[in-house]
Amino acid sequence: MSTTAVFIPPQIMVTSNVEKVPISIITHSSDSNFIAYRLNNKLNIFDNKLNKLGELESGSQHTGIIRSIEFTKNNQSLITSSSDKFLKIWDTTNNFKNIKSINTNKKIICSILNKDDSEILVSDKCGDVFKYSLIDDSKNKIEVSGDKSAKHDEKESDKNLVFGHYSSIVDIKFSPCFNYLLSADRDEKIRVSHYPNCFDIESFCLGHTKYVTEILLVPGRDDLLISGSGDGTIKLWNWKQGKCLQTVDFNSKHENAITIPQVVFKVDATTTTNQLIFSIENSNNIYILPMNVEKGEFNQSELKTIPLTQSSPISIDLIDNGKTILASLLPTTKEVDVAIAFDSTTLSQQSDNKVVIAINSVDASTTLKPAELKSVLESIEKKQYRKHVSYSKQMMNSTDNKNKEDDDLSLDEQDIDDTTDINNNNKNKNQETIQDSRPLKLRKMTIEGDKEIQKELEEKESKKQEE
């Protein structure tokens, strides 16, 4: 077992090189009875008690890419969200029967359940977060007009809107006390908002130079947050203060590193050490970075790696009450499995793990059309985030003819809500005009931001009266 990372040439996810559809999301119930994962773009369940895969009604599956899978805290329900704009509730006590589907009319990126699992927050591709009741459907009604010119005003008055970012939100987490909401976006920042009054911002965690990939809260230290990024670093934060406590840089070990925090866990009750399991996109290693919880710092000298001979890891979860590391792989050949397991203490491979055997026994050969498979793979890759630009970057690009980065920063119309209308013919208009075209929902939702918006509206009204 090596204690230092070895550079392995990147394996680009090319559609023609993928022999099986990879598992892109893995999670488990807190009682360890169930493991849920996305395979072949469908929800799959492994029942630990019965030691077998569950069978879901074929007609109840999502029609789009599943974006999130989360068990309720009492483990009686499973909530999934999808790019098909639906939330689905599955009854874990009744063979995972789909008991409710909620049409959000939003292209969902990620979601999180509230404290009592009565509501779910979802972020859409425009950087907005909306709240939906899982109990009272009357709270989820949204009036939609057929008049496209009224779309922006519609979304402004959407009673489900909680808050918004300038750019797409890639991850959201509640603080352990559920009084704060932490949101990370493609514009390199992490925002800490009071909840439910999210316009009241506690702090910003600023320091990443590229998009944030994932954020994780630290068990045993409610004040600490871990983040990964396209800048190749792992950062440790005091999130309430917005203070970066430590940065671990992996660019010297991996070219164009993209770090993805996967799981952070406490080794046992008698130690002050936590372990962060993370991956680096296109690297054939699983990394384990020890962390001293009391001191609030990573121990870089004790970095461990689990080399994978078959493929790079995609999604990683800790199962069997913390005893097993379960990872999904990118199968570039028919011989490569879709899942692999390791002992979390010895880091030795568990070839006889019952979950892995069951998952790998399913025919995962791709049956998706090339375009569908491409969409699935793009939803896995974290570097997809650099393909999308926020309204703030759109504003800068339109007033500067210089090349800002590369073509990946151009707006992808599929990833901007259908109700958002940006006319490419307006590139030569001045900054004020472009700023006015931005929906208010994407403006900085602070008390100061609210004042700025009110001032702009007053100026507009004054100009109209003068005319």
Curated annotation (Swiss-Prot):
Q: Which GO terms describe its biological process?
A: tRNA (guanine-N7)-methylation; tRNA modification
Highest taxon, organism lineage: Eukaryota
**Region listing for Disordered, in residue ranges:** 415-467
Q: Where is the composition biased (Basic and acidic residues)?
A: 445-467
- GO CC, one annotated term: cytosol
Q: Where are the WD repeats?
A: 61-100, 164-203, 207-249
List where Low complexity composition bias occurs.
421-434
Question: Where does it localize?
Answer: Nucleus
- Name the PANTHER family for this protein: TRNA (GUANINE-N(7)-)-METHYLTRANSFERASE NON-CATALYTIC SUBUNIT WDR4, WD40 REPEAT PROTEIN 4
- Complex formation: Forms a heterodimer with the catalytic subunit mettl1.
| Free-text function comment from the UniProt entry | Required for the formation of N(7)-methylguanine at position 46 (m7G46) in tRNA. In the complex, it is required to stabilize and induce conformational changes of the catalytic subunit.
Family of this protein? Belongs to the WD repeat TRM82 family.
Which HAMAP family does the UniProt entry name for this protein?
TRM82
Official protein name in the record = tRNA (guanine-N(7)-)-methyltransferase non-catalytic subunit wdr4
